[in-house]
């Protein structure tokens, strides 16, 4: 039992970067992926629910890619978010990035349509 407590104490003292490195090393050693484990753990609860899923009311608008017409996309991002030119340009060039969060479905669809018309690739999550 003392060995387990020492392991807990050692793990608790790790920095975030050290913990991430440890996770990566364990994934390589054991031949697993932490993302796959989360997906597998979430799947049984979703499948066993049986009740109809509630319709999502809030969406996140994610700029997936700027496309060929970057200037038009930057203009549209500025109009939607109210960001300055530099901030909008950085957001567009850093895609994929969330553009707006907690948006109603109809507003999210309007934003998506406007950005796609400007040449961007957009995802609603």
Swiss-Prot record:
Pfam families: Ribosomal_L12, Ribosomal_L12_N. CDD domains: Ribosomal_L7_L12. GO terms for molecular function: mRNA binding; structural constituent of ribosome. It comes from the Bacteria. One of its GO terms (cellular component) is cytosolic large ribosomal subunit. One of its GO terms (biological process) is translation. InterPro entries: Ribosomal_bL12 (IPR000206), Ribosomal_bL12_C (IPR013823), Ribosomal_bL12_C/ClpS-like (IPR014719), Ribosomal_bL12_oligo (IPR008932), Ribosomal_bL12_oligo_N_sf (IPR036235). Belongs to the bacterial ribosomal protein bL12 family. NCBIfam families: L12. This is Large ribosomal subunit protein bL12. It comes from Afipia carboxidovorans (strain ATCC 49405 / DSM 1227 / KCTC 32145 / OM5) (Oligotropha carboxidovorans). The gene is rplL.
């Amino acid at each position: 039992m003392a060995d387990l407590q020492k392991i807990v104490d050692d793990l608790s003292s790790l920095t975030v970067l050290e913990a991430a490195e440890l996770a990566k090393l364990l994934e390589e050693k054991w031949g697993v992926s932490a993302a796959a484990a989360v997906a597998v753990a979430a799947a049984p609860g979703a499948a066993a629910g049986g009740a109809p899923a509630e319709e999502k009311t809030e969406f996140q608008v994610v700029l997936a890619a700027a496309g060929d017409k970057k200037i038009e996309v930057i203009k549209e991002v500025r109009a939607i978010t109210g960001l300055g030119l530099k901030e909008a340009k950085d957001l567009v060039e850093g895609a994929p990035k969330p553009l707006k969060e907690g948006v109603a479905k109809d507003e999210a669809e309007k934003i998506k349509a406007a950005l796609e018309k400007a040449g961007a690739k957009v995802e609603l999550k």
